[in-house]
């Protein structure tokens, strides 16, 4: 195939046309435009049929572009092609605007016909304007090329800046807003008013200080007195934030797992977040004025008077803080913290000037001599159900732990009744109830053991005396203790026997129900087996596999639901068991009270009878018989007054 291009303006054909005159045009011969004279005008290729469709002109490639042509892709070649057409259009339009003679010459070239050319190929030489879409594409390609050149010169900072600008331009998709409910949520402890924090996290011993302050001071008294630069060296921020979040959730983290500097930073953070000054805005100027007194006695007296005017919460917190810091200063050899260092650290934290802090630290005994830092005792935990926690051994320790657990139980009930839904608090509630049940049971056992030891001691002391003295001077207190113990044991035994019979009947009914259900299952399986032998299954293997998958999914779902129900059932059974024990205990106490009441009425009647008869008292030997008769009467029979314990 032979392709034809317009010759350049400086070609020999233009010179010939200029020599022949401007008014005449002639058709050039085949020799004048032969390929040997104009090698760039024709390009030989495969021959094409004479009436072929319209072909696009090939790309015009320069020498410089040929060197780099192998490194460029299709996109670069298309750019060159479009640029070549634009240049050709601008040159031709400019020539046409300059002189009409050139237009005529160009018409002459268009009129020229060669036998191998068709009418359709003549259209390739006509200059047409490109549509708007192609112009828009060209401009877009040029902009992209310009951006690529700029991107090569970009640094990392420029790339990050450009990415941020693109991110700002993008509008975030607006998600549908969820209607907010008015459910109460826990407010943070850090930054809360001091009185509010005290009411929410006060310890069981009644000292009106927040738990975070008490526990931090207690930890620092144990582990921070040998740490160099304590309160000056900051702790790890991530751990401090972790502890802060735990206290904001009203939890009690184990500070033993953290370093002293971390706990010290937590304490400073709490003091820094207090919404009000410890010395209050009204009294702060007066404290500053008191520092300017001439004598130390006047300073101390004025400070004592101003401290009495402080609110109760502020005075208590300030006294504990100053006494604790005085302990740190006393360990200056280990901590390397003297009055000046502590004042520099504490002044911006609590917003108190160095002058006031210096007076407080130098007169601790006169101002806070009666303050004693009481150690914190954590309530007992029972997080692992597989192991039993170590309970106190003495009655005093058990009673103290019961007070702690009851205080914690009341706090949990208050939070849950306030509408705050917290699964961890619900679990802690069950845990506290289990601990209380175990503690009360152990307290009863301790009282019983103490009573038995006391009785054994009394019996041992009485065995040394004569039999006659034992009969006449028998200790009424020991008899009463024995009777009370015997009555309590017998009544408790009766209640437990009644509960045992009730549980046995319930177990028997459950076994019958299990046997009935097993029989029904066996009958259903036999029916299905017989039906499978008589029926013919014509379903495809694909439908059977799908049914099996659906049945497997349903089975897994049912198993998961069954596990959840078993867990709930275990919790309910445990709660029912604990309630039954409490009911048995109450019934025993009720029956004991009834027995004591009947015994007191009987004694009153016996005392009234001798008075009616003339004041004749019973013989000494009759006293022993009456005591033994009272023992036999106080013993309840196992078959009498037996009641079943309902669920």
Swiss-Prot record:
Disordered, as annotated region: 1-151, 163-186, 525-550, 601-647
Composition bias type Basic residues, residue spans: 69-79, 102-118
Modification Phosphoserine, positions: 29-30, 34, 48, 62, 92-93, 461, 463, 637
Residues that bear N-acetylthreonine: 2
InterPro entries according to UniProt: RALBP1, RalBP1-like_Ral-bd, Rho_GTPase_activation_prot, RhoGAP_dom
Biased composition (Acidic residues): 535-550
Annotated stretches, region: Nuclear localization signal: 102-119
Compartment(s) of residence: Cell membrane; Cytoplasm, Cytosol; Cytoplasm, Cytoskeleton, Spindle pole; Nucleus
GO CC, any one term: plasma membrane
Protein name in the entry: RalA-binding protein 1
Organism listed in the record: Rattus norvegicus (Rat)
Annotated gene: Ralbp1
């Amino acid at each position: 195939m032979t392709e034809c291009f317009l010759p350049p303006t400086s070609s020999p054909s233009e010179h010939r046309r200029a020599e022949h005159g401007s008014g005449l045009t002639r058709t050039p011969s085949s020799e004048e435009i032969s390929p040997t004279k104009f090698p760039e005008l024709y390009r030989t290729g495969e021959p094409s049929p004479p009436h072929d469709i319209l072909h696009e002109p090939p790309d015009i490639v320069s020498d410089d572009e040929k060197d780099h042509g192998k490194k460029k892709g299709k996109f670069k070649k298309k750019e060159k092609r479009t640029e070549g057409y634009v240049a050709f259009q601008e040159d031709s339009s400019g020539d046409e605007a300059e002189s009409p003679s050139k237009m005529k010459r160009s018409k002459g070239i268009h009129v020229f016909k060669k036998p191998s050319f068709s009418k359709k190929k003549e259209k390739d030489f006509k200059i047409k304007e490109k549509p708007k879409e192609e112009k828009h594409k060209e401009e877009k390609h040029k902009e992209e090329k310009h951006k690529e050149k700029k991107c090569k010169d970009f640094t990392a900072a420029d790339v990050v800046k450009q990415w941020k600008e693109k991110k700002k331009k993008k509008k975030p998709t607006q998600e549908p807003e969820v209607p907010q409910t008015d459910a109460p949520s826990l407010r943070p402890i850090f930054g809360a008013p001091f009185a509010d924090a005290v009411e929410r996290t006060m310890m069981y011993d009644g000292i009106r200080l927040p738990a975070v302050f008490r526990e931090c001071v207690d930890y620092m008294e144990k582990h921070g007195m040998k740490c160099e630069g304590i309160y000056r060296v900051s702790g790890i921020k991530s751990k401090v934030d972790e502890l802060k979040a735990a206290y904001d959730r009203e939890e009690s983290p184990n500070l033993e797992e953290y370093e002293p500097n971390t706990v010290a930073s937590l304490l400073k953070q709490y003091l820094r977040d207090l919404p009000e000054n410890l010395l209050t805005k009204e009294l702060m100027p007066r404290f500053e004025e008191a520092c300017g007194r001439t004598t130390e006695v006047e300073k101390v007296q004025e400070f004592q008077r101003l401290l009495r005017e402080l609110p109760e919460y502020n005075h208590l917190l300030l006294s504990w803080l100053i006494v604790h810091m005085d302990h740190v200063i006393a360990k200056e050899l280990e901590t390397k913290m003297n009055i000046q260092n502590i004042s520099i650290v504490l002044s911006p934290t609590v917003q108190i000037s160095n002058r006031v802090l210096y007076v407080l630290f130098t007169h601790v005994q006169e101002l806070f001599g009666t303050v004693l830092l009481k150690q914190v005792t954590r309530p007992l935990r029972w997080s692992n159900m597989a192991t039993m926690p170590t309970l106190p051994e003495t009655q005093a320790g058990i009673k103290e732990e019961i007070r702690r657990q009851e205080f914690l139980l009341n706090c949990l009930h208050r939070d849950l009744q306030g509408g705050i839904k917290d699964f961890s608090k619900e679990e802690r509630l069950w845990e506290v109830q289990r601990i209380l049940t175990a503690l009360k049971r152990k307290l009863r056992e301790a009282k019983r053991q103490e009573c038995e030891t006391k009785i054994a001691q009394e019996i041992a002391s009485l065995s040394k005396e004569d039999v006659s003295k034992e009969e006449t001077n028998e200790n009424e207190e020991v008899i009463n203790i024995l009777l009370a113990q015997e009555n309590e044991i017998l009544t408790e035994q009766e209640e437990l026997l009644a509960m045992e019979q009730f549980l046995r009947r319930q177990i028997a009914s459950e076994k019958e129900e299990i046997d009935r259900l097993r029989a029904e299952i066996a009958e259903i399986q036999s029916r299905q087996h017989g039906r499978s032998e008589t029926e013919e299954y014509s379903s495809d293997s694909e439908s059977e596999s799908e049914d099996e998958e659906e049945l497997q999914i349903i089975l897994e779902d049912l198993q998961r639901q069954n596990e959840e129900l078993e867990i709930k059932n275990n919790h309910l059974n445990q709660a029912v068991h604990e309630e039954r024990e409490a009911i048995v205990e109450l019934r025993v106490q009720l029956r004991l009270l009834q027995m004591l009441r009947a015994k007191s009425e009987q004694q009153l009647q016996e005392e009234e009878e001798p008075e009616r008869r003339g004041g004749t008292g019973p013989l000494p030997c009759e006293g022993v018989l009456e005591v033994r008769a009272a023992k036999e009467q106080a013993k309840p029979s196992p078959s009498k007054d037996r009641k079943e314990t309902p669920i």
